[in-house]
């Protein structure tokens, strides 16, 4: 009788291990799989079976277009006018392996890269040209970011400059607000 319960418990544990290692990858996602700590495979949408204790899901990556809205960056134009510019980056993961292992914090890396690129582009322009050339700025930033993020498995679809606000205008608005209080 005891043997029966032991066998029943073993069968139950075996079934539990097998069922817990059946993985369904949803549409528009991929899973990066590591076997014994090193990259093994990238699973696409569908049913997969993971080898217990040998394989693990290292990262679940969305293939949908993602939006990263970055805070305003202080930049200086060629004619030494300081302004605040905030950007929105639309990107998509194209290679889950590179995205997982290419850079430690991809969103933070994109933010730093976009801020540096924005400073370089705006630094070559004068204030008037900056205010009227939003499409040119968007195109240049998109091209530079897309090329730089290729090695991370990321495609930058577009970059939008949301606001271009000269700092003198910001100070004027702050003084108006204080005066109204």
Question: Residues of each region from the PLM?
Answer:
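General alpha-helical segment detector with a strong preference for membrane-spanning helices
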Residues: 99, 179-180
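Amphipathic, interface-forming alpha-helical segments with heptad-repeat character
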Residues: 25, 33-42, 48-167
């Amino acid at each position: 009788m005891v043997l029966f319960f032991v066998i029943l418990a073993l069968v139950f544990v075996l079934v539990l291990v097998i069922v817990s290692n059946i993985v369904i990858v949803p549409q528009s996602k991929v899973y990066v799989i590591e076997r014994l700590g090193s990259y093994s495979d990238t699973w696409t949408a569908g049913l997969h079976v993971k080898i217990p204790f040998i394989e693990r899901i290292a990262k679940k990556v969305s293939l949908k277009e993602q939006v990263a809205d970055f805070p305003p960056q202080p930049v200086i134009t060629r004619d030494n006018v300081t302004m605040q510019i905030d950007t929105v980056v639309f990107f998509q993961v194209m290679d889950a392996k590179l995205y997982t292992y290419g850079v430690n914090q991809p969103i933070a890396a994109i933010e730093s890269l976009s801020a540096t690129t924005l400073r370089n582009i705006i630094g070559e322009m004068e204030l008037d040209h900056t205010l009227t050339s939003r499409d040119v700025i968007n195109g240049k930033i998109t091209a530079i970011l897309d090329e730089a993020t290729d090695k991370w498995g990321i495609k930058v679809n577009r970059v939008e400059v949301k606001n271009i606000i000269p700092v003198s205008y910001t100070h004027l608005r702050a003084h108006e607000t204080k005066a109204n209080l």
